[in-house]
Design a protein with these regions (language model features):
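Metal- and O2-centered redox machinery and metal/ROS homeostasis
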Residues: 1-92
Length: 92
């Protein structure tokens, strides 16, 4: 996946996350940013990588997002590979 596609995907995920105040607050706490800061920095690839990581760490949130947007459950992990830090080698 190209980075631009992955960034668009992550922006959709962030918009979905912003609709859930509890989950958004958890993400804000984990990131060390306020919700306003997160939204201001939404175009930064590193932040978007963190958004996708957050979805990948929360199975219920991931399933809700995928179901609401008709996205195959494997897509977020593939998109993550195109964002900063996602191209790490697999040693197995």
């Amino acid at each position: 996946m190209e980075q631009e596609q992955a960034e668009i995907f992550a922006l959709k995920a962030l918009a979905f996350l912003a609709q859930n105040e509890d989950k958004m607050n958890i993400f804000a706490n984990l990131s060390g940013l306020g919700t306003g800061d997160i939204l201001q920095r939404a175009g930064e690839p590193e932040l978007l990588a963190g958004v996708v990581d957050f979805f990948l760490s929360d199975e219920e949130l991931l399933a809700d997002f995928c179901n609401a947007n008709d996205i195959h459950p494997d897509t977020p992990a593939r998109m993550r590979q195109a964002l900063p830090g996602g191209d790490l080698p697999h040693w197995t």
